[in-house]
Protein backbone atom coordinates (compact mmCIF):
# COMPACT_ATOMS: atom_id res chain seq x y z
CA UNK A 1 0.00 0.00 0.00
CA UNK A 2 1.33 3.47 -0.85
CA UNK A 3 2.24 5.94 1.89
CA UNK A 4 -0.75 8.09 0.99
CA UNK A 5 -3.15 5.16 1.28
CA UNK A 6 -1.56 4.15 4.59
CA UNK A 7 -2.01 7.72 5.82
CA UNK A 8 -5.64 7.81 4.72
CA UNK A 9 -6.27 4.51 6.49
CA UNK A 10 -4.56 5.72 9.67
CA UNK A 11 -6.48 8.97 9.62
CA UNK A 12 -9.76 7.11 9.25
CA UNK A 13 -8.90 4.73 12.11
CA UNK A 14 -7.87 7.56 14.44
CA UNK A 15 -10.90 9.72 13.69
CA UNK A 16 -12.65 8.18 16.69
CA UNK A 17 -9.96 9.70 18.94
CA UNK A 18 -10.19 13.16 17.38
CA UNK A 19 -6.63 13.11 16.03
CA UNK A 20 -5.98 16.68 14.93
CA UNK A 21 -2.25 16.94 14.35
CA UNK A 22 1.27 16.32 15.59
CA UNK A 23 2.09 18.06 18.85
CA UNK A 24 5.35 19.64 19.93
CA UNK A 25 5.38 21.28 23.36
CA UNK A 26 8.11 23.75 24.22
CA UNK A 27 8.85 26.68 26.51
CA UNK A 28 7.93 30.21 25.42
CA UNK A 29 11.58 31.26 25.10
CA UNK A 30 12.24 28.33 22.76
CA UNK A 31 9.06 29.16 20.83
CA UNK A 32 10.35 32.68 20.11
CA UNK A 33 13.58 31.23 18.72
CA UNK A 34 11.66 28.69 16.63
CA UNK A 35 9.48 31.41 15.10
CA UNK A 36 12.46 33.64 14.34
CA UNK A 37 14.40 30.69 12.89
CA UNK A 38 11.46 29.55 10.78
CA UNK A 39 12.00 25.90 11.65
CA UNK A 40 11.75 23.38 14.46
CA UNK A 41 15.22 21.96 14.99
CA UNK A 42 16.50 18.77 16.55
CA UNK A 43 17.97 19.11 20.03
CA UNK A 44 21.49 18.80 18.62
CA UNK A 45 20.92 21.53 16.03
CA UNK A 46 19.17 23.83 18.51
CA UNK A 47 22.01 23.50 21.01
CA UNK A 48 24.62 24.05 18.29
CA UNK A 49 22.88 27.26 17.22
CA UNK A 50 22.34 28.30 20.86
CA UNK A 51 18.56 28.34 20.44
CA UNK A 52 17.55 25.97 23.25
CA UNK A 53 16.85 27.74 26.53
CA UNK A 54 14.74 25.20 28.42
CA UNK A 55 14.30 21.46 27.98
CA UNK A 56 11.11 19.57 28.75
CA UNK A 57 13.21 16.46 29.23
CA UNK A 58 16.70 16.52 30.72
CA UNK A 59 17.48 12.82 30.80
CA UNK A 60 21.05 12.01 29.97
CA UNK A 61 20.28 9.05 27.67
CA UNK A 62 19.76 10.17 24.08
CA UNK A 63 20.16 6.84 22.27
CA UNK A 64 17.25 4.41 21.95
CA UNK A 65 17.30 1.27 19.80
CA UNK A 66 20.39 2.59 18.07
CA UNK A 67 18.73 5.95 17.33
CA UNK A 68 20.40 9.18 18.49
CA UNK A 69 17.29 11.04 19.63
CA UNK A 70 19.11 14.37 19.75
CA UNK A 71 19.34 14.29 15.94
CA UNK A 72 15.54 14.27 15.53
CA UNK A 73 12.60 16.58 16.01
CA UNK A 74 10.00 14.94 18.22
CA UNK A 75 6.21 14.99 18.19
CA UNK A 76 3.33 13.53 20.18
CA UNK A 77 0.03 12.39 18.69
CA UNK A 78 -2.14 13.74 21.49
CA UNK A 79 -1.97 16.63 23.98
CA UNK A 80 -1.19 16.58 27.69
CA UNK A 81 1.14 13.60 27.81
CA UNK A 82 2.36 12.32 31.15
CA UNK A 83 5.74 13.95 30.45
CA UNK A 84 4.11 17.38 30.79
CA UNK A 85 3.14 16.69 34.38
CA UNK A 86 6.81 16.72 35.30
CA UNK A 87 7.84 19.88 33.49
CA UNK A 88 4.98 22.30 32.86
CA UNK A 89 4.79 25.62 34.71
CA UNK A 90 6.99 27.81 36.91
CA UNK A 91 7.81 25.76 39.95
CA UNK A 92 7.77 27.43 43.34
CA UNK A 93 10.81 25.44 44.42
CA UNK A 94 13.06 24.60 41.50
CA UNK A 95 15.51 21.75 41.91
CA UNK A 96 17.19 21.66 38.52
CA UNK A 97 14.65 19.25 37.06
CA UNK A 98 13.21 19.24 33.56
CA UNK A 99 11.36 22.48 33.17
CA UNK A 100 8.99 24.20 30.75
CA UNK A 101 8.11 27.39 32.69
CA UNK A 102 5.71 28.87 30.11
CA UNK A 103 4.38 26.06 27.90
CA UNK A 104 3.46 26.64 24.26
CA UNK A 105 2.01 24.02 21.91
CA UNK A 106 3.03 23.89 18.25
CA UNK A 107 0.67 21.81 16.12
CA UNK A 108 2.02 20.40 12.85
CA UNK A 109 0.15 18.80 9.97
CA UNK A 110 -0.60 15.10 10.23
CA UNK A 111 0.80 14.36 6.78
CA UNK A 112 4.32 14.48 8.22
CA UNK A 113 3.87 10.83 9.21
CA UNK A 114 4.38 10.03 5.52
CA UNK A 115 7.98 11.28 5.63
CA UNK A 116 10.13 8.40 4.37
CA UNK A 117 12.66 8.99 7.17
CA UNK A 118 10.06 9.06 9.96
CA UNK A 119 10.49 6.84 13.01
CA UNK A 120 7.53 5.69 15.09
CA UNK A 121 8.07 4.90 18.79
CA UNK A 122 5.16 3.09 20.45
CA UNK A 123 5.80 5.00 23.68
CA UNK A 124 8.22 7.45 25.25
CA UNK A 125 11.27 7.18 22.99
CA UNK A 126 13.62 7.22 25.97
CA UNK A 127 11.84 4.40 27.75
CA UNK A 128 13.74 1.13 27.34
CA UNK A 129 10.44 -0.73 26.90
CA UNK A 130 9.42 1.28 23.85
CA UNK A 131 9.79 -0.16 20.37
CA UNK A 132 10.64 1.74 17.18
CA UNK A 133 9.05 1.14 13.77
CA UNK A 134 10.62 2.61 10.66
CA UNK A 135 7.55 2.58 8.43
CA UNK A 136 4.00 3.87 8.68
CA UNK A 137 2.34 0.59 7.74
CA UNK A 138 3.88 -1.36 10.61
CA UNK A 139 3.28 1.46 13.09
CA UNK A 140 -0.34 1.69 12.03
CA UNK A 141 -0.97 -2.01 12.64
CA UNK A 142 1.11 -2.60 15.75
CA UNK A 143 0.90 0.52 17.91
CA UNK A 144 -1.65 0.70 20.75
CA UNK A 145 -3.52 3.73 19.44
CA UNK A 146 -6.25 3.49 22.05
CA UNK A 147 -3.58 3.73 24.73
CA UNK A 148 -1.86 6.61 22.93
CA UNK A 149 -5.03 8.72 23.00
CA UNK A 150 -6.29 7.64 26.43
CA UNK A 151 -6.62 10.59 28.80
CA UNK A 152 -8.39 9.02 31.75
CA UNK A 153 -7.10 9.64 35.27
CA UNK A 154 -3.95 7.58 35.50
CA UNK A 155 -2.75 5.37 38.32
CA UNK A 156 0.81 6.57 39.15
CA UNK A 157 1.90 2.92 39.20
CA UNK A 158 0.54 2.20 35.72
CA UNK A 159 3.87 2.31 33.90
CA UNK A 160 2.47 0.94 30.65
CA UNK A 161 -0.14 3.68 30.22
CA UNK A 162 2.37 6.37 31.17
CA UNK A 163 4.78 5.11 28.52
CA UNK A 164 2.25 4.61 25.72
CA UNK A 165 0.62 8.01 26.18
CA UNK A 166 3.98 9.47 25.23
CA UNK A 167 4.21 7.67 21.86
CA UNK A 168 6.37 9.75 19.53
CA UNK A 169 6.97 10.49 15.88
CA UNK A 170 10.59 11.40 15.09
CA UNK A 171 11.69 13.34 12.02
CA UNK A 172 15.38 14.00 11.26
CA UNK A 173 17.19 17.30 11.74
CA UNK A 174 14.57 20.01 11.16
CA UNK A 175 11.01 20.69 10.09
CA UNK A 176 10.23 23.98 8.35
CA UNK A 177 7.32 25.95 9.78
CA UNK A 178 6.16 27.12 6.37
CA UNK A 179 3.57 24.69 5.06
CA UNK A 180 3.83 22.40 8.12
CA UNK A 181 2.78 24.47 11.15
CA UNK A 182 -1.01 24.61 11.42
CA UNK A 183 -1.54 26.18 14.87
CA UNK A 184 0.26 27.72 17.84
CA UNK A 185 -1.69 27.24 21.05
CA UNK A 186 -1.18 29.37 24.17
CA UNK A 187 -2.40 28.74 27.67
CA UNK A 188 -3.47 32.32 28.45
CA UNK A 189 -4.23 35.70 26.96
CA UNK A 190 -1.02 36.96 28.57
CA UNK A 191 1.07 34.44 26.63
CA UNK A 192 -0.71 35.37 23.39
CA UNK A 193 -0.09 39.09 23.98
CA UNK A 194 3.57 38.38 24.69
CA UNK A 195 3.91 36.45 21.43
CA UNK A 196 2.27 39.23 19.44
CA UNK A 197 4.46 41.84 21.13
CA UNK A 198 7.56 39.92 20.06
CA UNK A 199 6.86 38.35 16.66
CA UNK A 200 3.71 40.22 15.62
CA UNK A 201 0.22 39.09 14.70
CA UNK A 202 -0.13 35.58 13.31
CA UNK A 203 -3.43 33.96 12.25
CA UNK A 204 -2.16 30.62 13.56
CA UNK A 205 -2.07 31.91 17.16
CA UNK A 206 -4.90 30.81 19.46
CA UNK A 207 -5.72 30.21 23.12
CA UNK A 208 -6.92 26.85 24.46
CA UNK A 209 -6.10 26.14 28.09
CA UNK A 210 -7.55 22.62 27.80
CA UNK A 211 -4.42 21.62 25.88
CA UNK A 212 -2.36 22.18 29.04
CA UNK A 213 -2.42 20.92 32.59
CA UNK A 214 -2.89 24.43 33.96
CA UNK A 215 -2.57 24.12 37.73
CA UNK A 216 -2.11 20.39 37.71
CA UNK A 217 1.36 18.91 37.86
CA UNK A 218 3.17 16.25 39.84
CA UNK A 219 5.95 16.81 42.29
CA UNK A 220 9.20 14.91 41.83
CA UNK A 221 8.69 12.08 44.29
CA UNK A 222 8.77 9.74 41.29
CA UNK A 223 6.29 7.34 39.82
CA UNK A 224 4.93 5.12 42.54
CA UNK A 225 6.16 7.45 45.30
CA UNK A 226 4.15 9.79 47.49
CA UNK A 227 3.20 12.13 44.69
CA UNK A 228 0.82 15.07 44.97
CA UNK A 229 -0.56 17.66 42.63
CA UNK A 230 1.12 21.06 42.71
CA UNK A 231 -0.18 24.50 41.88
CA UNK A 232 2.06 26.24 39.35
CA UNK A 233 1.21 29.92 39.15
CA UNK A 234 1.39 32.18 36.12
CA UNK A 235 0.00 35.41 34.65
CA UNK A 236 -3.46 35.02 33.12
CA UNK A 237 -3.77 38.45 31.50
CA UNK A 238 -2.43 41.98 31.68
CA UNK A 239 -3.15 45.46 30.35
CA UNK A 240 -0.60 48.27 30.29
CA UNK A 241 -1.27 51.92 29.54
CA UNK A 242 0.46 55.27 29.95
CA UNK A 243 -1.11 58.33 31.57
CA UNK A 244 1.23 61.31 31.41
CA UNK A 245 4.46 60.17 33.03
CA UNK A 246 2.87 57.20 34.78
CA UNK A 247 2.73 53.61 33.60
CA UNK A 248 -0.38 51.78 34.78
CA UNK A 249 -0.58 48.00 34.74
CA UNK A 250 -3.48 45.74 35.65
CA UNK A 251 -2.64 42.04 35.80
CA UNK A 252 -4.11 38.81 37.08
CA UNK A 253 -2.71 35.48 38.25
CA UNK A 254 -4.08 31.98 37.82
CA UNK A 255 -3.91 31.36 41.55
CA UNK A 256 -3.60 33.32 44.79
CA UNK A 257 -0.48 31.27 45.60
CA UNK A 258 1.85 34.29 45.34
CA UNK A 259 4.06 34.42 48.43
CA UNK A 260 5.85 31.18 47.46
CA UNK A 261 7.44 32.96 44.49
CA UNK A 262 9.97 35.76 44.03
CA UNK A 263 8.42 38.56 41.93
CA UNK A 264 10.16 41.24 39.88
CA UNK A 265 8.64 44.10 37.89
CA UNK A 266 11.23 45.80 35.69
CA UNK A 267 11.39 48.71 33.25
CA UNK A 268 14.43 48.83 30.97
CA UNK A 269 15.12 51.96 28.92
CA UNK A 270 16.94 52.07 25.59
CA UNK A 271 19.87 53.75 27.37
CA UNK A 272 20.23 50.74 29.68
CA UNK A 273 18.76 52.45 32.74
CA UNK A 274 16.46 50.19 34.74
CA UNK A 275 13.75 50.55 37.35
CA UNK A 276 13.09 47.48 39.45
CA UNK A 277 10.31 46.71 41.89
CA UNK A 278 10.66 43.46 43.85
CA UNK A 279 7.09 43.19 45.04
CA UNK A 280 6.06 41.10 48.03
CA UNK A 281 2.53 39.68 48.00
CA UNK A 282 0.90 39.03 51.33
CA UNK A 283 -2.71 39.09 50.13
CA UNK A 284 -4.82 36.37 48.57
CA UNK A 285 -6.12 38.29 45.55
CA UNK A 286 -5.49 37.18 41.97
CA UNK A 287 -5.97 40.63 40.39
CA UNK A 288 -3.53 43.47 41.03
CA UNK A 289 -2.77 47.02 39.91
CA UNK A 290 0.62 48.69 39.71
CA UNK A 291 1.68 52.26 38.92
CA UNK A 292 5.21 53.39 38.15
CA UNK A 293 6.66 56.79 37.22
CA UNK A 294 8.53 56.62 33.92
CA UNK A 295 10.93 58.64 31.77
CA UNK A 296 8.45 59.28 28.99
CA UNK A 297 10.82 60.68 26.36
CA UNK A 298 12.86 57.45 26.15
CA UNK A 299 11.84 54.08 24.61
CA UNK A 300 11.44 51.28 27.16
CA UNK A 301 10.31 47.71 27.70
CA UNK A 302 8.40 46.21 30.62
CA UNK A 303 8.97 42.78 32.10
CA UNK A 304 7.38 40.87 34.94
CA UNK A 305 9.03 37.72 36.24
CA UNK A 306 8.38 35.15 38.92
CA UNK A 307 11.27 33.02 40.10
CA UNK A 308 13.34 34.57 37.33
CA UNK A 309 10.99 33.45 34.53
CA UNK A 310 9.60 36.28 32.45
CA UNK A 311 5.82 36.26 32.13
CA UNK A 312 5.22 39.73 30.63
CA UNK A 313 6.89 41.16 27.51
CA UNK A 314 5.65 44.68 26.67
CA UNK A 315 7.28 47.44 24.63
CA UNK A 316 6.61 51.15 24.18
CA UNK A 317 5.56 52.17 20.66
CA UNK A 318 8.94 53.82 20.02
CA UNK A 319 11.00 50.80 21.14
CA UNK A 320 13.45 49.67 18.43
CA UNK A 321 15.64 47.32 20.46
CA UNK A 322 15.58 43.51 20.49
CA UNK A 323 12.41 41.75 21.60
CA UNK A 324 11.91 38.48 23.41
CA UNK A 325 15.24 38.34 25.26
Positions of predicted regions on the chain:
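Active-site-proximal loop/hinge segments that shape catalytic or ion-binding/gating pockets
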Residues: 1-74, 79-325
Amino acid sequence: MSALKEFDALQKELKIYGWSGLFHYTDFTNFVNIMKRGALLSKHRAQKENLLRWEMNKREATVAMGVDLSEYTRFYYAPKTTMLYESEGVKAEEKGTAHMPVPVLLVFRKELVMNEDALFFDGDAENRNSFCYDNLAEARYKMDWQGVFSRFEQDPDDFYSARVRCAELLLPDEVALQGNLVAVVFRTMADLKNAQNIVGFNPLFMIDKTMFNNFKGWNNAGIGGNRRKNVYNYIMDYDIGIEGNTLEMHYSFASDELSRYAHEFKITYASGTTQVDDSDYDGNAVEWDLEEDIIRDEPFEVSYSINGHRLIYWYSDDWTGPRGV
